[in-house]
Amino acid sequence: MTLQRISKDYLKPNYGLILLIVSYFFNSSMVVSTKVLENDPLETSQSRINPLQILLVRMSITYCCTLVYMHWNKQSVPDIPWGPAPCRKWLILRGIMGFFGVFGMYFSLMYLSISDAVLITFMSPTLTIFLSFLLLGEPFSKLEALGSLISFSGVVLIIRPTFLFGEQTQGQQSPQDDIVETQNPKLRLIAIGVSLLGVCGLSSVYIIIRYIGNKAHAIMSVSYFSLVTTVVAALGVLLIPSMSLQLPHSWKQWGLFLNLGISGFIHQILLTMGIQRERAGRGSLMTYTQVIYAVFWDVVLFHHWPNIWTWCGMAVIVSSTIWVINMRASKQNVVATAELLSTSDFELDDLED
């Protein structure tokens, strides 16, 4: 099989999916930086950076990157810096929904274990499929619905929530275990509710970006999201009494913050480009690759090897993802994808200009 045939049969028809897969790699890089900033064993507990403040720094750097990019490519980016007038209300809504998506995850982590919090966010692809069908009129086959369920089952094998697999005893517990997951039913209920609100926000972002399509440059979506999140996070840090502004105090922390901003910028650019080129339901399934990236970083950085359940879950996710990619869309959808690829004004090459 020649490279030309591979490009014609696999790369071009799945160009949007490839962009999404790469974008989630940069998202995983942000997660690693956040984890080190919050849980660095070399730092004292007083030196830990608040998650909302991490979000503030990350999004402010990302917004600065969007401004530099727009002015650097002013010939190909129209209506700088606010985008086309008819799309501005949708871009603002995209920023608001994007903030709810991020806030839901960060808030739930205060009271839920990481596994439970992540598991809830993976309800987003299924919700997106139904929203895209209801609001955008996009078709989705029974096989795609089955593929989403299979992928979700793989996530369950990796996350292994306690309400399905039971309590897993790992020696004597310390008094600080309540920090990992609260035992207060009311706090858990609030955390789950806010997390579900975040899921709705994530799914809404897919729908809004897909609705905007190519009517606005992809950088505008990133710009509005980062600006809205920066403003809201700054207000939270300034107005919430229990929070105070804490600057990084080492070159390592500054480097991690810089990686947060740059990776966030690249992630949002590729994510928007991928969503614009792929149906919302099929594209949202690529979020499951984040689980694979998480395992990769665990092994490389923290020397934590997956157990048998994790390997089984990875196999299920990879298999179902490949299955979805190779599913033949209807003749109508293939023509639409070809037209979208041929008329798009925003390509990866633009990032190199």
Curated annotation (Swiss-Prot):
Q: Which residues form a coiled coil?
A: none
Which region is the signal sequence? Answer: none
Span of domain EamA = 24-160, 200-326
Pfam short name (any one): EamA
Reply yes or no: does the keyword Ligase apply.
no
Localization, per the record, is: Membrane
Q: Spell out which residues lie on the membrane's Extracellular side.
A: 38-51, 116, 166-188, 240-254, 304
The record's GO CC annotations read: endoplasmic reticulum; membrane
Q: Does the keyword Heme apply?
A: no
- Write out the entry's keywords from A to Z: Membrane, Repeat, Transmembrane, Transmembrane helix
Which ranges of this chain reside in the Cytoplasmic compartment per its record?
A: 1-16, 70-94, 138-144, 210-218, 276-282, 326-353
Q: Which InterPro entries match?
A: EamA_dom
Q: Topology with regard to the membrane? A: Multi-pass membrane protein
**Please, which domain of life does this record's source organism belong to?**
Eukaryota
Transmembrane intervals: 17-37, 52-69, 95-115, 117-137, 145-165, 189-209, 219-239, 255-275, 283-303, 305-325
Q: What is this protein called?
A: Probable transport protein YPL264C
Q: Which organism is it from?
A: Saccharomyces cerevisiae (strain ATCC 204508 / S288c)
